[in-house]
């Protein structure tokens, strides 16, 4: 633990007090401060000027990162018949109908994303207590409730990420690994930030993106210049 603390302090010392970095500058610093022992995950966190308690100010979306996340997502699909066959062919990690629903109801959550055909959502809906708190419940708004389950699997495994504002008006998402090139990380961050900006609720007043930071696993947050977003 002491070694981690020492590494954290060493990384934090490279961040200038009171300075706000452009996304490009933050990426360069994140790569420099990321752990050399393993390929750290790079994340972006934003504080939005919205009231998540109001339905017309909810920010939720998906975006396909051009260079992926650096991790192959585990995807399960609730489907039967031809749709199940298509999901298997697309590379889904587990596919099933009532059997898979029962497995998840029993507490199985060893996956990163869940997809369902519309026909099975009546049964999948009862998994809300298991999937809801983990952000894994299939939803038409994020393309995870669809008759074209194969495309959903392709997209998710190809680098599609989901994000949604939490009750404190924060949103965070993975944009890659510290081992990515700076150009790859910059491309991913730009695409993700552009989508967050595009989804600004019309009911939101004042500054939309109030604060932001880029960080690596166990690393300090590098404050973003929100005027550069």
Curated annotation (Swiss-Prot):
CDD domains the UniProt entry points to: Ribosomal_L1
Keyword rRNA-binding: yes
Protein origin, superkingdom: Bacteria
The keyword Ribosomal protein belongs to this UniProt entry's keyword annotation: yes
Entry GO MF terms: rRNA binding; structural constituent of ribosome; tRNA binding
Gene Ontology CC terms, in alphabetical order: large ribosomal subunit
BP GO terms, sorted: regulation of translation; translation
Gene3D superfamilies xrefs: 3.30.190.20, 3.40.50.790
Record-linked InterPro entries: Ribosom_uL1_bac-type, Ribosomal_uL1, Ribosomal_uL1-like, Ribosomal_uL1/biogenesis, Ribosomal_uL1_3-a/b-sand, Ribosomal_uL1_CS
Record's keyword terms, sorted: Repressor, Ribonucleoprotein, Ribosomal protein, RNA-binding, rRNA-binding, Translation regulation, tRNA-binding
Function statement: Binds directly to 23S rRNA. The L1 stalk is quite mobile in the ribosome, and is involved in E site tRNA release.
PANTHER family cross-referenced by the UniProt entry: 54S RIBOSOMAL PROTEIN L1, MITOCHONDRIAL (PTHR36427), LARGE RIBOSOMAL SUBUNIT PROTEIN UL1M (PTHR36427:SF3)
Record family assignment: Belongs to the universal ribosomal protein uL1 family.
Assembly and interaction partners: Part of the 50S ribosomal subunit.
Protein name (database record): Large ribosomal subunit protein uL1
Naturally occurring in which organism (per UniProt): Leifsonia xyli subsp. xyli (strain CTCB07)
